[in-house]
């Protein structure tokens, strides 16, 4: 009798948990997350639009005859492109990228494109991670993204060192979007740890702009590298809020409804304090800038 009486109660609790999870994930406006943050200055945010255009240019096959240029173009000089690597050249170890010597803005930029939905190698990089699998500088990082970051750094560190030494007043900037944002964040951290390989460049000359990055570093590393890495999140962008442990979702695609139910119950019943205390949990890297452009239902 007690079991039968308990069934409706359990169902109600379950439904309330699912409703709360749905509210948080789908209806709760992201503007509330940053409503108490300070406003960014124009000087802080100035590089972002320019670097976004530069990242977009990596998608082009021929920068002299672009096919998908935004209004006003990419704002770059094709003659200042030092190298531009394709999937064939990276061998699937990383997404395509470009090194650009920006004389107008006194900047050496390594820009990496985002996830290519048609490339299996990109998924392999993103899904190559387990909770607490890889340690770095006293914290935890995403295993697949770190391997891609090390591959690019090792491949281009001599070229970057030459550019830094030939242009001692230029900053070294890493910029990327989505999957590429996670990779450049870890490249920046790896570069800070190996500045001797870049001609002993000062830490203050290294910076990173990660547009909609994947969660790739533990909380202590996100804070420690906040002076180097800047993460830009647009409105309700899901990637910086979504765990990178997606292997189970892809492996269980045929029982996705059951998996989502388990996820919402676990998310509802786990205290935020407990999540924050887990040193292995990954977060968006560095200092966060949140762009809020609209309100819900408006």
Feature locations, PLM:
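Non-catalytic, mobile gating and regulatory segments of ester bond hydrolases
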Residues: 1-175, 179-298
